[in-house]
Design a protein with these regions (language model features):
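Bacterial N-terminal signal peptides that target proteins for export
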Residues: 1-11
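Protein maturation boundaries and topogenic segments
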Residues: 29-32
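Short, intrinsically disordered, charge-biased short linear motifs at domain edges
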Residues: 8-9, 34-37, 77-82
């Protein structure tokens, strides 16, 4: 990837996230009553990623309920390694998530993936998973937030909590039947509003 392409992709992502933040306050239809989320104590920290897919992930972002203060973004991450181990995206500051696990909390996760078509050309696509639950974690010893990207356009969000034998150990690949894995779909809205670069 050329230096210009990296700069262009970074600028495009920053623009998309800025526009999405601005668009959040615009009324687009009839007024609908909204349940305001309860205020919870938040922690801020790095977000990391593991990629078990064969596709490069340019970036991703987590969105909590409106006005909750919950959300953040994550790093780019290379495709799965030839030896079957996931690639890791280093820490990116700062994501805000509840200090204590909230079972009712639902997030939206959006990510930009570079996939190859049958003709070999690379195409970027925005994906999203809605109603994503964070895997349960113990408060008091939380560490980094992790987005784990799995084959089939799936994602799992977790916080490390010091329990190396529990379900929040980034060294362990989540089981395919893990109830905290969310299915992603092509994000038609963001692909239309913020078209990714193509070869």
């Amino acid at each position: 990837m050329t230096r210009w392409r990296v700069v262009r992709t970074s600028l495009l992502l920053a623009l998309c996230l800025s526009l999405a933040a601005c668009a959040g306050g615009q009324q687009t239809g009839p007024e609908v009553p909204v349940e305001v989320p309860q205020k919870v104590r938040l922690l801020a920290g790095d977000t990391k990623a593991l990629n078990y897919t064969p596709w490069y992930i340019h970036s991703f972002a987590l969105f909590g309920p409106s006005r909750s203060g919950i959300g953040g973004g994550g790093p780019n991450v290379m495709p799965i390694k030839a030896n079957g181990r996931p690639s890791e995206g280093g820490g990116k500051c700062c994501t805000s998530l509840p200090a204590e696990w909230q079972p009712e909390l639902k997030l939206t996760v959006r990510w930009l993936v570079e996939k190859k078509r049958a003709d070999g050309k690379k195409w970027g696509y925005w994906y999203k998973a809605e109603n994503v639950q964070i895997a349960p974690y113990s408060s008091g010893n939380t560490g980094d937030a992790w987005a784990i990207f799995l084959p089939g356009d799936r994602v799992r969000i977790m916080l490390t909590d010091g329990n190396r034998d529990g379900g929040n150990n980034p060294n362990n690949r989540p089981a395919d039947n893990d109830p905290y894995i969310a299915q992603g779909v092509i994000d038609e809205e963001w692909n239309r509003r913020y078209p990714p670069a193509h070869d």
